Amino acid sequence: GELQMEIDAALLRWAAGAPHRLVVRTYGWTRPTLSLGRVEPFPAGWDTEAIARDGLDVARRPTGGDAVLHAEEATFAVAASVPGPWADAPRAFAERVADAVAAAYQTFHLAAERVPSTERGPTLPAGATPCFARTAPGEVRVGSFKLAGIASKFTRGGALSHASLPLTGRHRDVARYRHDASQAAALLAGHARGAEELLGERLSAEQVQERIVAALAVAFGVALRPAPFAEAGLRAPVLGYPA
């Protein structure tokens, strides 16, 4: 888990290093992983014995947001120069990514949409609820259900968004590991669904990731090509559009 977060952070540094860079990465998890927002409290509020007993990895994201249990999902990251040739301010970049996620889900005949910035709920302390227990502006929903948890980080000249796209209801199990398990479970039951649950058929992470990559290419107006991680100063395969 920590390695995945380090890679995403490194891609952000690479993207910020020149004015015309964009890279997309899809990845998975070798075991269920609890990822925490950059300033979310831990271990306070968590049942660390249960986390250890069930073999969960724990990682802290370079981005904000609240806790996500990564299991049975599709995951991706996109980092880009900002404003870049797409002339995006940081928030516009994040919204472009969310719109691409919604467009990818729409190809599966799901009525996905980005939550508009006008729908702001109450401001809660970091870690007050799991990520999927509520929707926030810039994330993706189908009806009242949150379908994608998207977190972003912005630096001078660069932006990163990475996302958890649950396929099943496994992500709701995050409630089991919280001290407020009953309350968290109730919130998740009312707000969180996986794509398979809404679609009523099986999906693979690869299917979803393929649609995401295609939608991001359209959203940013680029032709993505396979590239070695070394091209971004790393050591694994990525999809990228280097300067």
Give names to the regions the model predicted.
Residues 27-29, 37-39, 79, 150, ...:
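Structured loops at beta-to-helix junctions and adjacent beta-edge loops in soluble globular domains
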Residues 69-82:
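DPxDG-like acidic metal-binding loop motif
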Residues 41, 68-69, 153:
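Short, electropositive, low-hydrophobicity segments enriched in small/polar residues
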Residues 1-53, 57-61, 127, 131, ...:
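Active-site loop/lid in soluble adenylation, ligation, and acyl-transfer enzymes
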Residues 82-216, 240:
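Catalytic beta-strand/loop module used to bind and position nucleotide/cofactor moieties
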